[in-house]
């Protein structure tokens, strides 16, 4: 249960009970009331701004109104004390019995604790990675892959119906270049000396194997075909090979998509999907024939000094109108974006999330304009931009072997440090902030390595369970037994740990609403820190040890607390796509 939602309802009920009315009549607007943890934990457990946001409407001084509300809240049987602070904040401190009762709820819910129905009935498409199928994934793709995957997992946990999607850019000019590059490797595999790879083609050694496979399958037959026919075959085989490589790279990172959508699908049957999308926009009055003035700076590839078919995107929030069809009748890449969004909308998605690299910042307004025009404002589109990742080794820029050409691959990074450190650390900054990834730091066993610190907390929880088996003979811990004596958890440090656990449902919902999966990584680190601190207190003070052989009921209660910590760590790490280890290896 979200305790902050619980007390939001209680506070609003209290406002009704004291018959609070606006001075001008009508109903009070309670939508701006906030209920959250105080910024300073010493001030209490729950804080609300109710008096400050309502004072003007009711015509009363904020502190006086706060005192009136506070007095009424003291009647709540779960409230220990109520204080008014600053200009009119109301801080509530809750009784230990409340936290003991909430801990039992958490224990009974297990790893489902924190699961929400926030997104019930909402269908969301999260598109991420969508790397061009021209080679292995490089480290620049890594952050977007993790952010998109974890965001999708988070939204699912918050009750949304989520589809993870990868858009295969397999219809552009770069694919023609790729096919010609592989054709060269095919000739090489047949024994021809090809010399230096010509400028403009892909030089990567990863294409050698594709050429060899073509030579094994076709022999010299491709050389005997008309070039266009041979290149079409090479293109299909190469896209399949590149996507197999990309899927393997993603699998190594524990990233899995539900849908792989081919751009070529938009171009079948004389690009019927694109034509239909443009026709729909035309019927809505969003398309016209015109000539765009030359933009400042470097000219984009779709600008022409002649009449084109244009999208009236400035009427729906964009900076400039966008070309859909060139003067020669060919479609722009942007026209495909329109058709692809329409395809998503026609599949019933209420919301589309695009996770893109920071170099795609110029796409944001045009995509938002497409969403407004295609859906008549009914669908929500969000673009998350991921800033660059800089690689370091002991504080110095990383120097790594580049086995795939001119870049460090995603697989290089995962193979060296492991999947879990990569996933966790890619979340340890907000996606729109640059991120430094230090190979030494993410493998050291210290508090300064967040993923180690969190996973070590999980392992420590299980070590407590093993101690219970050794010292108390409790091999199979029973949740009913563990939850039957929570009234014995009275130490302030234990209650503080319960408070931290109780924040989890609110954290899940806020991270989902704001689409900020990094919040989960931060929370797990804080929870791990709280648990490690409690462990250390037991080391310093025998009375606070989790296992008290001479007090089995207290031991069971503390084991229940440890079980909930383990459940929340497991839940959060699962959403992140990392393991919750039972022991460190």
Swiss-Prot record:
It comes from the Bacteria. It catalyses: tRNA(Arg) + L-arginine + ATP = L-arginyl-tRNA(Arg) + AMP + diphosphate. It is found in: Cytoplasm. Belongs to the class-I aminoacyl-tRNA synthetase family. One of its GO terms (biological process) is arginyl-tRNA aminoacylation. The keyword Transferase does not apply. NCBIfam families: argS (TIGR00456). This is Arginine--tRNA ligase. The lineage of its organism: Bacteria, Pseudomonadati, Pseudomonadota, Alphaproteobacteria, Hyphomicrobiales. CDD domains: ArgRS_core. PROSITE patterns: AA_TRNA_LIGASE_I. Its EC number is 6.1.1.19.
């Amino acid at each position: 249960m979200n305790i902050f939602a619980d007390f939001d309802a209680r506070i609003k009920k209290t406002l009704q009970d004291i018959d609070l009315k606006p001075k001008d009549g009508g109903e009070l607007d309670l939508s701006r009331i906030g209920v959250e943890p105080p910024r300073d934990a010493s001030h209490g457990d729950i804080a609300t701004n109710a008096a400050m946001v309502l004072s003007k409407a009711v015509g009363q001084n904020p502190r006086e109104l706060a005192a009136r509300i506070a007095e009424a809240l003291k009647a709540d049987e779960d409230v220990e004390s109520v204080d008014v602070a600053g200009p009119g904040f109301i801080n509530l401190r809750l009784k230990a019995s409340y936290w003991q009762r909430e801990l039992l709820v958490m224990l009974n819910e297990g790893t489902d604790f924190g699961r929400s129905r926030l997104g019930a009935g909402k269908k969301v498409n999260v598109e991420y990675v969508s790397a061009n199928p021209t080679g292995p994934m490089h480290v620049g793709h890594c952050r977007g892959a993790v952010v998109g995957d974890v965001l999708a997992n988070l939204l699912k946990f918050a009750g949304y119906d989520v589809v993870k999607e990868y858009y295969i850019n397999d219809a552009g000019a770069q694919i023609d270049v790729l096919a010609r590059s592989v054709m060269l490797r095919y000739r090489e595999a047949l024994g021809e000396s090809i010399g230096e790879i010509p400028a403009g083609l892909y030089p990567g050694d990863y294409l050698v194997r594709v050429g060899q496979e073509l030579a094994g399958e076709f022999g010299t037959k491709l050389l005997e075909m008309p070039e266009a026919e041979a290149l079409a075959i090479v293109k299909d085989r190469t896209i399949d090979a590149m996507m197999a490589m990309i899927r393997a790279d993603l699998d190594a990172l524990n990233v899995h998509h539900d849908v792989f959508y081919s751009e070529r699908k938009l171009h079948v049957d004389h690009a019927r999907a694109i034509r239909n999308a443009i026709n729909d926009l035309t019927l809505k009055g969003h398309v016209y024939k015109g000539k765009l003035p030359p933009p400042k700076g470097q000219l984009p590839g779709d600008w022409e000094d002649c009449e084109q078919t244009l999208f009236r995107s400035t009427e729906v929030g964009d900076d400039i109108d966008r070309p859909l069809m060139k003067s020669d009748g060919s479609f722009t890449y942007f026209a495909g974006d329109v058709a692809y969004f329409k395809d998503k909308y026609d599949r019933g998605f209420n919301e589309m999330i695009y996770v893109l690299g920071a170099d795609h910042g110029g796409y944001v307004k045009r995509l938002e304009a497409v969403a407004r025009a295609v859906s008549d404002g009914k669908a929500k589109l969000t673009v998350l931009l991921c800033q660059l990742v800089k690689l370091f080794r002991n504080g110095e820029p990383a120097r790594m072997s580049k086995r795939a050409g001119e870049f460090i691959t995603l697989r290089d990074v995962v193979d060296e440090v492991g999947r879990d450190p990569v996933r966790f650390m890619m979340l340890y900054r907000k996606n729109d902030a640059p991120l430094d990834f230090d190979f030494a730091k993410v493998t050291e066993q210290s508090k300064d390595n967040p993923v180690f610190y969190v996973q070590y907390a999980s392992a420590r929880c299980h070590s407590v369970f093993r101690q219970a088996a050794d010292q108390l003979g409790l091999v199979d811990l029973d949740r009913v037994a563990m939850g039957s004596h929570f009234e014995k958890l009275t130490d302030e440090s234990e209650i503080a740990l319960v408070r931290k656990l109780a924040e989890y449902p609110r954290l899940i919902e806020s991270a989902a609403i704001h689409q900020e999966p990094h919040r989960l990584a931060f929370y797990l680190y804080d929870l791990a820190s709280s648990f490690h601190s409690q462990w250390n207190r037991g080391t310093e003070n025998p009375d606070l040890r989790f296992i008290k052989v001479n007090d089995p009921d207290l031991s069971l209660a503390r084991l229940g607390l440890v079980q909930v910590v383990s459940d929340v760590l497991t839940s959060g790490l699962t959403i992140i796509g990392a393991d919750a280890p039972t022991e460190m290896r």
